[in-house]
Amino acid sequence: RDYRRSGMSLSEEDREKLKTIQKKLGTLTIEFDTNIREDKTIVPIPLGDLEGVPQDVIDGIDVVDENYQVTLDYPTFGPILDYCSVAETRKNVRFAYSKRAGLENVEILERIIKLRDEASDLLGYATTADYETETKMSKNAATVAEFYEKLRPVVRKKAEKDWAELLAAKREDLGDPTADFYPYDFSYYYEKIKNDKYAVDSQKVQEYLPLQNVMDGLFEITQNL
């Protein structure tokens, strides 16, 4: 199997093609990740529209022309989605986050998909999914699809229950029995339910788990593995 996957069974010409494809894939994957990591999108948010966001987060955001200059790094983006009570702010920030490096990366993603298909075809696999799953427990794409079909009704039942709870929380919060639920509402009402129902405040928990302490703890654990 490894012999086949590495392309050793191919002709010399096809092995060279495979090497070229793999090199391009490596370069494109790095470029894709770099574009997201280095995205400099700024979302202008009017003063007063970060209500509910922890003050230490707000204090770290620049202000220009009566607007907060919200960046999309997680330490800023995360708390806004979790705690900002202004729906329009959550909507704008989440939408911008989902589009990070979109113009550059859509083209790169299309090229990656095409190259992966070419590599799978060259190696004799029916699909890229079959190539990717061959070394996994599932062994092939058909097994994965079958598993998902069996899992779907089980997961759906729990998801519908969670969805109903989140929707009810939003409608109660707004006093609007007809309010709809949107993707940018999820984190906010999930945190609200945790706080209201289970008295779990993620911000309070973080006070006892500062990043450096967590990193030091993880380092100590890995040293003993």
Locations of regions flagged by a protein language model:
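A conserved hydrophobic secondary-structure block that centers on an alpha-helix together
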Residues: 7-18, 99-114, 118-131
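Short acidic alpha-helix initiation/capping motifs at coil-to-helix transition points
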Residues: 1, 71, 107-111
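Second-shell loop/turn segments in exported
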Residues: 3-4, 78-80, 98-102, 133-144, ...
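Short, charged/polar, low-complexity loop and linker segments
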Residues: 3-4, 93-96, 198-200
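Active-site-adjacent "gating/activation" loops or surface patches in catalytic cores
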Residues: 63-100, 186, 191
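Extended, charged alpha-helical coiled-coil/arm scaffolds that mediate oligomerization and mechanical coupling
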Residues: 1-36
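Active-site-proximal, well-structured secondary-structure segments within enzyme catalytic domains
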Residues: 24-27, 34, 38-72, 115, ...
